[in-house]
A protein has these predicted regions:
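Extreme N-terminal starter segment of soluble prokaryotic enzymes
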Residues: 1-5
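A secondary-structure boundary/capping signal
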Residues: 6-8, 52
Length: 118
């Protein structure tokens, strides 16, 4: 039986909310949810993982925040791809910018376990 883990609408980003220890607590909540998702994948071992867009909350952000959000996405996609081949689809332009997805394409260039579709 083919098992597919389908996920999307991660909306990685900083949202208005409290800061704890200088960190946006909403961003930390998103990271904890992504960590749970990866643990679920590691436990249930799907044959294929599909990430269907809206990975990022905002398409246009300042460089330091944008780099942190892109690094979070890359690290999480890499963790998922260690479980099963992973297909990443670009979402709506107001969330997933062309530049963000070019960074994902570059990050996973030559990695046969990840396909980024723009």
């Amino acid at each position: 039986m083919l098992k597919v883990l389908h996920t999307g609408d991660w909306h990685i980003g900083s949202f208005p909310g409290p800061e704890v220890g200088g960190q946006n607590s909403r961003f930390q909540d998103i990271c904890r949810c992504l960590d749970f998702q990866a643990m679920y994948a590691e436990e249930h071992r799907p044959n294929l993982i599909v990430v269907s867009g809206d990975i990022f909350h905002q398409a246009r952000v300042w460089s330091d925040r944008g780099l942190r959000e892109s690094r979070t996405a890359i690290d999480h996609i890499r963790r998922l791809s260690n479980v099963a081949p992973t297909v990443v689809l670009r979402g709506t332009p107001n969330h997933d910018s062309e530049e963000q997805f070019e960074m994902l394409v570059t990050a996973f260039y030559g990695d046969d376990s990840v396909s980024v579709v723009t």
